[in-house]
Amino acid sequence: MKIIMLGAPGAGKGTQAKKIAEKYKIPHISTGDIFRANIKNNTELGAKAKEYMDQGLLVPDEITLDMVMDRFAQDDCKNGYVLDGFPRTIPQAEALNKALVEEGEQIDYAINIEVPDELIVSRMSGRRACVSCGGTYHVVFTPTKKEGICDACGGELTIRDDDKPETVAKRLNVYHNQTQPLINYYHGLGLLEEVDGTKEALEVFEDIIGILGKVAQ
């Protein structure tokens, strides 16, 4: 079972991808993890990517795609995977599809988690992170016992730059311009399934399992 997760930043893609991976015993593959692993292991692709990253430049699509395809070739992916964070643009999606077809492979489902922008902003701007231990909380969903103080270590909580409302708004703008067109792309391939991401995480997961059950059977 080969799955691509789609949705705006803060829609819950990573959370659901982990749950799917655990249930079906397939790896959760995030591009961030792939980059870190290649750079840490000083692979040829990692070295190429690091050159761009050190200059503050975007890593070219072909390097990212090579890393993704290399990850797919590993033994733990033989029964499938959940891909999170790639593709982000139509050219990336087309290149990924071409590379998979050349390997005699194909994606089974592209799952889009739908959440309105205003809820995304509310969710992300409520996140807090501990400056000491890195623990994460949410002022509404997972509040600490004492406001502004980490339950685990007593450290101070802060809002990460990525979670500030103005930053979230910019990220959503990029998403709508670059990534949202993927919804139409995968719909055109007959692979798109959409779920309501405004529900509780467990309900969203149950909806996804209902979709994936059609493949798993």
UniProtKB/Swiss-Prot annotation:
One Pfam family linked to the record: ADK
Binding site for AMP: T31, R36, L57, L58, V59, G85, F86, P87, R88, Q92, R160, R171
Pathway noted in the entry: Purine metabolism; AMP biosynthesis via salvage pathway; AMP from ADP: step 1/1
SUPFAM superfamilies: P-loop containing nucleoside triphosphate hydrolases
Subcellular location: Cytoplasm
Residues noted as binding Zn(2+) in the record, renumbered to the chain: C130, C133, C150, C153
Molecular function per GO: adenylate kinase activity; ATP binding; zinc ion binding
UniProt region (LID), positions on chain: 126-163
Protein name (database record): Adenylate kinase
Taxonomic source organism: Lachnoclostridium phytofermentans (strain ATCC 700394 / DSM 18823 / ISDg)
Name of the gene: adk
